[in-house]
Curated annotation (Swiss-Prot):
One CC-aspect GO term: exodeoxyribonuclease VII complex
Protein name: Exodeoxyribonuclease 7 large subunit
Nuclease among keywords: yes
HAMAP family xref list: Exonuc_7_L (MF_00378)
Pfam families: Exonuc_VII_L (PF02601), tRNA_anti_2 (PF13742)
GO molecular function terms noted in the UniProt entry: exodeoxyribonuclease VII activity; nucleic acid binding
Family per record: Belongs to the XseA family.
Role description: Bidirectionally degrades single-stranded DNA into large acid-insoluble oligonucleotides, which are then degraded further into small acid-soluble oligonucleotides.
Length: 445
C-alpha cells in the first residue's frame, strides 16, 4: 500500500470538524421562510423544515423555547426564525437550532425594534444610574391603560385586595393602533407635570409584536426617560419586551405583578402597624412623663418664689438671728463674770491679812533651831572643801593615775632621782594595787 501523508479521518471526526466550522462561521442568523413537515413528539420539542422555492433546511426548536411561541406552527405558515447553524453529528444532518420564531409579518417590525433599541441604549436611556427608586409608600397612583382591557381589571383587583386605601386615578387611553402611542405619551406628560402622583403605571395585556408596537414608540420612550415621576412599565406577558420596559424605572412582567410591586399586602402591614402603635404609645408615655417632671420642677420653683415662701424664709432668718443674738449676749455676760472673778482674786491677793500671814511665816524661820540647822549645813560644806584639798596632795592618788613610788627595801627611803641608785641594786616599786621587787640595770642617766 502506498504511503499517504494526508490525515485520515473517521466519519465522526469529520462531522465534528464540520460542526465546529458551521458554528464558528454562523453564530446567529435570521431566516424568513415557509414551514413544512411540522412535528411535535411527546418530548415537547418542535421539528420542521424551513423552505423557499429552491431550497430547504432542517430545523429544531427545543421545549424550553417552543413553549413560549405566540402562534401555532402549521404547514405553509410563513415565519421569521432566529437560530444557530449546527450539524447533527450522528447522521451528518445540517440543521438550524432556533431560539426565537414569529410570524413573518412581524419581521420588519422586529428589525426596526432592534435598531431603535440599540440607538437608545447607546444614548444611555437604559442605564441603571438614571433610573429612579420607587417610594416606600405609594399614596397616589396614575394608571395609563385601556379602561376595558384585562390589564386594568387585574391591576385594580390586586390593588383592592392588597391595599384598598391607595388612591388610584385611571387615565384611559388607546393601547393599540396608530394613535395609541401619541395618546399614551400625552397622558404621561400631563400626569408627570401635575406633580400629583407618586408613581405612574403604563400597562396593557399580551399580544403580538404588532399589537404592542405603540409601546415601542420613540417619543414615548423619551417621555418616560424625561419624567420626574417614577414610571413602571408592565406591557404584555413575561416573555414580551417593549422599549417602554427598557426605559422605565421599573419593569414588571405582567400587570398583576406591577400592582404587587407598588403596594404592600395589608395583612403584612397589620403587625407593622401594631408595632408602630406600641412604639408611639411608648413615646407618648415617655414624653408625658418628661412633661410631668418639668411641670413638677416649675411648681417647685414657683412655690420657692411665692410671697408666702419668702415670708417663711424671713421668719426663719429672724429666729436664727434671735438665737445668734442670745448666744452672743451669753458669751459677753460670761466674759464679764470671768473678769469680775479675776478682779476679786487680785483684790484678795493684796489683802493685808494675807500679807501678815507671810510675815509671820518668815518670823518662824528665824527660830533658834532653824539657825542651828543652817550652821550645820555651812560646816559640812567647809569639810568637803578640805577633803578635796587633801585628796589632791595624796601620793596614793598619784599612784592611782599610773605612777609608782620607788623605795629601798632596807630602810623604806624613797628614791627621788636616778643618781641615788647603783646598777644591780634591788628596789621596791609601790603601785596602785600592790608592790613589786625591781633591779637596777646599767643604762644612761
Amino acid at each position: 500500500m502506498a504511503e499517504r501523508n494526508e490525515q485520515i479521518l473517521t466519519p465522526s471526526q469529520l462531522n465534528a470538524l464540520a460542526r465546529d466550522l458551521l458554528e464558528g462561521s454562523f453564530p446567529l442568523v435570521w431566516v424568513e421562510a415557509e414551514l413544512s413537515s411540522v412535528t411535535r413528539p411527546s418530548s415537547g420539542h418542535l421539528y420542521f423544515t424551513l423552505k423557499d422555492a429552491r431550497a430547504q433546511i432542517r430545523c429544531a426548536m427545543f421545549k424550553p423555547k417552543s413553549t413560549w411561541l405566540k402562534f401555532q406552527p402549521r404547514e405553509g405558515l410563513r415565519v421569521l426564525a432566529r437560530g444557530r447553524l449546527t450539524l447533527y453529528e450522528a447522521r451528518g444532518d445540517y440543521q438550524l437550532v432556533l431560539d426565537h420564531m414569529e410570524e413573518a409579518g412581524e419581521g420588519a417590525l422586529r428589525r426596526a425594534f432592534d435598531a431603535l433599541r440599540a440607538r437608545l441604549a447607546a444614548e444611555g436611556l437604559f442605564d441603571a444610574e438614571r433610573k429612579q427608586l420607587l417610594p416606600a409608600h405609594v399614596q397616589r397612583l396614575a394608571v395609563i391603560t385601556s379602561p376595558s382591557g384585562a390589564a386594568v381589571r387585574d391591576v385594580l383587583s390586586v390593588l383592592a385586595r392588597r391595599f384598598p386605601l391607595l388612591e388610584v386615578d385611571l387615565l384611559p387611553s388607546l393601547v393599540q393602533g396608530d394613535s395609541a402611542a401619541a395618546q399614551i405619551t400625552s397622558l404621561l406628560q400631563r400626569a408627570d407635570a401635575s406633580g400629583r402622583y407618586d408613581v405612574i403605571l403604563i400597562t396593557r395585556g399580551g399580544g403580538s409584536l404588532e399589537d404592542l408596537w405603540a409601546f415601542n414608540d420613540e417619543r414615548l420612550a423619551r417621555a418616560i426617560a424625561a419624567a420626574q415621576t417614577p414610571v413602571v412599565s408592565a406591557v404584555g406577558h413575561e416573555t414580551d419586551f417593549s422599549l417602554s420596559d427598557f426605559v422605565a424605572d421599573v419593569r414588571a412582567p405582567t400587570p398583576s405583578v406591577a400592582a404587587e410591586l407598588l403596594v404592600p399586602d395589608q395583612r403584612e402591614l397589620v403587625p407593622r402597624v401594631r408595632r408602630a402603635q406600641a412604639r408611639m404609645t411608648q413615646l407618648q408615655q415617655h414624653a408625658l412623663g418628661n412633661a410631668m417632671q418639668r411641670a413638677d420642677r416649675l411648681a417647685l420653683r414657683l412655690r420657692a418664689h411665692s410671697p408666702q415662701a419668702r415670708l417663711q424664709l424671713l421668719h426663719r432668718r429672724q429666729e436664727e438671728a434671735g438665737r445668734q443674738l442670745g448666744a452672743r449676749m451669753t458669751q459677753v455676760l460670761e466674759r464679764l463674770q470671768a473678769r469680775v472673778q479675776r478682779g476679786h482674786a487680785q483684790v484678795q491677793s493684796h489683802n493685808p491679812q494675807r500679807h501678815l500671814a507671810g510675815l509671820q511665816q518668815r518670823l518662824r524661820a528665824l527660830h533658834p533651831q532653824a539657825a542651828m540647822q543652817r550652821r550645820l549645813q555651812h560646816d559640812q560644806l567647809q569639810l568637803r572643801s578640805i577633803a578635796r584639798s587633801l585628796e589632791a596632795v595624796n601620793p596614793l592618788a598619784t599612784v592611782a593615775r599610773g605612777y609608782a613610788i620607788v623605795t629601798r627595801p632596807a630602810d623604806g627611803s624613797v628614791v627621788r632621782s636616778a643618781a641615788e641608785v647603783a646598777a644591780g641594786e634591788r628596789l621596791r616599786a609601790q603601785l596602785a594595787d600592790g608592790s613589786i621587787e625591781v633591779r637596777v640595770e646599767p643604762g644612761e642617766r
